[in-house]
Amino acid sequence: MEFLAELHPKVVHFPIALLLTFIFLELIGTLLNKEFYTKTAHLILFLGVIGTILAVLTGNQAFIAYEYWNPASEALFNNHQTFANLTVWYFAGLLVLRTYLIVKKKYLKTIKYIFLALTLFGGYLVYQTSEYGGELVKKYGIGTELKINDTEIND
């Protein structure tokens, strides 16, 4: 499953972009009361949830494949994993709830504003997941193939 581990750095940016785009479209659609934006937001949310599932699956494989964990990097990974799992479940729940409300024709103005607040909190989860993931790369080089030899140091 090392193949999946190698995909994580390539896959992970799609759900980040999709979920942040969803939040933006949800904000615009709710504030301007434009159905085009809210319908587009629903589609982007669906794609974002699929992306987060793929990111978590590949991230779990990347954790297994990496051999050089120390207590500090593993603690940072645990925070990253916790927020990643929260993000997947949170946005999947929003997708199910939103779909239900739309099907039952209950996705009305007051509900849209409540849903917008829930959506903005989801943005916080995306941010925290990204922050911890970025720290894993920046501090520990996890997910990179950085190789430094003596000739590079002396240049």
Regions found by a protein language model. Give the residues of each.
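Polytopic transmembrane helical bundles with strong interfacial aromatic enrichment
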Residues: 1-155
